[in-house]
Amino acid sequence: MKLITAIVKPFTLDDVKTSLEDAGVLGMTVSEIQGYGRQKGHTEVYRGAEYSVDFVPKVRIEVVVDDSIVDKVVDSIVRAARTGKIGDGKVWVSPVDTIVRVRTGERGHDAL
């Protein structure tokens, strides 16, 4: 099993969610976050004054999937989140040793 973590622009979330459902993902965790990479920050104007905003709003999506669909899920996220502009985000894959469904006590693949 693998944990797939994606950091994407907030306005792409609906497209990514639909794409993940089409890829067979049954559930996900979504968190609103802030950060910066090469994009750095941006400037905004408020009441005529320009302000530098160091952190950019992003969305973190986390899904645990079976090894057999990892590439399909990663490709689905990338396709749905790509705008071609700087700041589109990142996707990474981490190993998951075990998973337990709290309600039933099921473990491993049965808990997915």
From Swiss-Prot:
GO terms for molecular function: ADP binding; ATP binding; enzyme regulator activity. Keywords: Nucleotide-binding, Phosphoprotein, Transcription, Transcription regulation. One of its GO terms (biological process) is regulation of nitrogen utilization. Transmembrane segments: none annotated. The modification O-UMP-tyrosine is found at Y51. GO terms for cellular component: cytosol; plasma membrane. The keyword Transmembrane helix does not apply. Pfam families: P-II. PANTHER family: NITROGEN REGULATORY PROTEIN P-II (PTHR30115), NITROGEN REGULATORY PROTEIN P-II HOMOLOG (PTHR30115:SF11). Belongs to the P(II) protein family. Homotrimer. In nitrogen-limiting conditions, when the ratio of Gln to 2-ketoglutarate decreases, P-II is uridylylated to P-II-UMP. P-II-UMP allows the deadenylation of glutamine synthetase (GS), thus activating the enzyme. Conversely, in nitrogen excess P-II is deuridylated and promotes the adenylation of GS. P-II indirectly controls the transcription of the GS gene (glnA). P-II prevents NR-II-catalyzed conversion of NR-I to NR-I-phosphate, the transcriptional activator of glnA. When P-II is uridylylated to P-II-UMP, these events are reversed. This is Nitrogen regulatory protein P-II. The gene is glnB.
